Amino acid sequence: MTMRSPLTNDHPQPLRASPLSEHDDEIQIRLDDSRYRSFPPPRRVVQRNTPAPIQLQDFEFPKQSHDIPGHYPMIDEIYPDVHPYRTSEDGFVSLTNGDNMAQNKRASRSRPWMQNLQTQDRIQRYKKRRPATKWMKWMNSDWKNHIVAVIGELIGTSLFLFFGYAGIEVAKLQGREPPDLEVLFYISATFGASLMVTAWIFFRISGGLFNPAVTLALAILKAVSPIRAFLLVITQLGASCLAAILVQEIFPKQLDVATTLGSGTSMGQGFVIEAITTAALIFTIIMLAVEKHKATFVAPIGIGLALFVAHMVAVPFTGASLNPARSFGPSAIVWNFPREHWIYWVGPILGAGLAVLFFRLIKLMEYEMANPGQDGDPENDPTQNPELDVAQNAHEREEEVLGLSNGKSWYRDDSSSGSMRRKESVNSFTGGRRSMDRRGDIFRRLDDVEAQWRRQQYRNVV
């Protein structure tokens, strides 16, 4: 009879747990069902690693699953990413700790079957694609938002100027010029309605600016970042050229929508008209759209009406640009820039500066306190919402004035009991809805209480 070595045995011995355990039968069922039994060891392979049987005292068996009562998780369920046990050549199960893993990596270079054994099941486990990390980062990046805003501004500005240019072409079909009141009203209504509709559509995407002067004003107010402002200005100029090309190619009449000075209008007069009308338009945008209030969602109506009124005044004298992009497109596609073209750039930019300056002035003077409650919006009313910055500033000023009038310095140590009591009283007061005229009485009473407390402390010390 020929003796066979354990290394050349076609049928390896079944997996056996350690005889030291009291649960050999329960664990043996799981070991016999393990998928690693489907990978028999190769023949005539020299065993380089010393096999180590399972020692249950070094292995903490996991708890039962909550989904299936009485179910013990398999080896793959315990360690889904790392195979903790390998079937050695002689039928034992070896523990794959850090040293054995390093040995297996070295051994896999000379034994390809071992590398396949380590990766075959792992490939099946990773059939489901991992999340696209780069795509997720891109979706959360600022540049993605800039691109969305640029696309919205491109389409919105193109539509706004397309309808405006087309309205001018329709108004001039009978050969009459803007001094005609009907033509003047038609052009003004077309531009005003076009801005109202397109701004209402795109203000949630890009802000619905459609005007480099408006973009500059919002950048000064830090309502738009400098990078986005630059991208939007370039987009608005390109959209004006696109709108002019569409009107020129679609309508049979020759394109005649360029802005020029009216007869008898000097450059200085045209410059002032453009600056004033643009300032009125931008200030309307700031107060209705930038300054949030109860009626912000209907701001496009007021903005469109402001443009309509400005066109009614400025069209006979300057053509009513109020927008550098509106004058740039028709002149750029035919490459014909008149001598007074600078007016339609410098005038609106100056108007934007005037609007921002006036807004900063009234904001510094806290215009909210001049006539509060006009919107019927308690959240933006400083007399009803003490959480507003304006209301808190008023509290601090009044408290400081009352403290100085009583001969006490407001700039005291915060660790003093009087200062802490004052802060607690102010916090309790700001949580209520009391009227503004009662603040003086409240703080005056607090000062009296603090004075009495200090006198009592002095008497105790003496």
From Swiss-Prot:
Bias (Basic and acidic residues): 410-425
Organism domain of life: Eukaryota
Keywords of this entry: Membrane, Repeat, Transmembrane, Transmembrane helix, Transport
Cellular location(s): Membrane
Domain commentary: Aquaporins contain two tandem repeats each containing three membrane-spanning domains and a pore-forming loop with the signature motif Asn-Pro-Ala (NPA).
Family: Belongs to the MIP/aquaporin (TC 1.A.8) family.
Function in brief: Water channel required to facilitate the transport of water across membranes. Involved in conidiation.
Protein name as annotated: Aquaporin-1
Organism, as annotated: Botryotinia fuckeliana (strain B05.10) (Noble rot fungus)
